[in-house]
């Protein structure tokens, strides 16, 4: 059974309220994980993952990004990322991570981004990478297919039962997505979309990503957004930048939402094993000290 999270509100640098959910383990946490969700979904869809991470000793935070979930609903801004677009979203996410650090001083903080959340996280690494003990990117790619390709994501899964068969082989999970009023581009129309269709490495300055930062890239091999090839290209790109610890895995036949796939237990076990091997008392810079933003 999923644990009911605590609800927080974090005011971002533009003065906008962001709704955040926190799942806390029964014992003192060994590290924190900040989950960044994808487009047209929301943070509480990661409750099952958060419960599993709690059982492994991790406190989990997940915010509803600008224009999404409770953040979008309570400000009547579903689908609207604000006047600064993607950069504003990244700064809002950074404010949440700062809250995590303030609530757990000295604890290593990891970030996990899914799909659009992985693109947010990659830009975050360029600007605030020293904040983190490690990064996990899933449902991701090196060069994004573009928002205009959304209508073609089901092409490989014909005859399709629903417009969202590309999300998962688990029909119950697809049906839950369809039934969720805070999911789907019909419910969350993109009222502003600068940079949402850029791949993980298509903007910003990669030279600012800390070389000591551990990164785990993992995709479903049948994911139409990146799949095995797009994920591998991103991992190879990170290695070419000089990062010391880059792990890549593609799961055969799995689709876009690995945490809602039929092999989700395998995926979660791999995530926990990766985190366990890297959870320390220092951040990725090795200092555990002050954090500085990059332009």
Per-region residue spans from a language model:
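Conserved alpha/beta-hydrolase "acid-adjacent" motif
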Residues: 224-233
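Short beta-strand/loop motif that positions the catalytic acidic residue
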Residues: 217-219
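Short beta-strand element of the alpha/beta-hydrolase
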Residues: 29-38
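Conserved alpha/beta-hydrolase
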Residues: 45, 50-76
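N-terminal cap/lid segment of alpha/beta-hydrolase-fold proteins
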Residues: 1-25
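Catalytic active-site module of serine/aspartate enzymes centered on a nucleophile-bearing elbow/loop
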Residues: 245-295
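Alpha/beta-hydrolase-fold enzymes
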Residues: 112-188
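Alpha/beta-hydrolase active-site loop
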Residues: 81-102
């Amino acid at each position: 059974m999923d644990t009911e999270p605590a609800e927080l509100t974090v005011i971002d640098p533009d003065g906008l309220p962001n709704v955040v959910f926190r799942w806390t383990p029964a014992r003192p946490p060994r590290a924190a994980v900040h989950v960044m969700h994808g487009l047209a979904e929301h943070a509480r869809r990661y409750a099952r993952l958060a419960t599993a991470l709690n059982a492994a000793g991790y406190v989990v935070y997940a915010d509803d990004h600008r224009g999404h979930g409770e953040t979008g609903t309570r400000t009547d801004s579903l689908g609207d990322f604000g006047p600064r677009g993607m950069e504003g979203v990244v700064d809002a996410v950074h404010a949440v991570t700062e809250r995590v650090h303030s609530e757990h001083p000295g604890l290593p903080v990891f970030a996990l981004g899914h799909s659009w959340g992985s693109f947010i996280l990659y830009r975050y690494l360029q600007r605030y990478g020293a904040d983190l003990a490690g990064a996990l990117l899933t449902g991701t790619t090196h060069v994004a297919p573009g928002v205009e390709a959304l209508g073609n994501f089901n092409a490989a899964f014909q005859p399709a039962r629903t417009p969202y068969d590309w999300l998962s082989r688990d029909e119950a999970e697809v049906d839950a997505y369809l039934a969720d009023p805070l999911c789907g581009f019909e419910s969350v129309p993109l009222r502003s979309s600068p940079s949402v269709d850029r791949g993980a490495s298509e903007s910003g300055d990669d030279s600012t990503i800390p070389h000591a930062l551990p990164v785990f890239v993992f995709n479903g091999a049948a994911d139409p957004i990146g799949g095995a090839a797009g994920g591998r290209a991103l991992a190879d790109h990170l290695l070419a930048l000089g990062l010391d610890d880059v792990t890549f895995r593609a799961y055969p036949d799995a689709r876009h939402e690995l945490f809602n796939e039929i092999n989700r237990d395998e995926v979660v076990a791999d995530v926990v094993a990766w985190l366990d091997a890297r959870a320390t008392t220092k951040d990725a810079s090795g200092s555990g000290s002050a954090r500085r933003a990059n332009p």
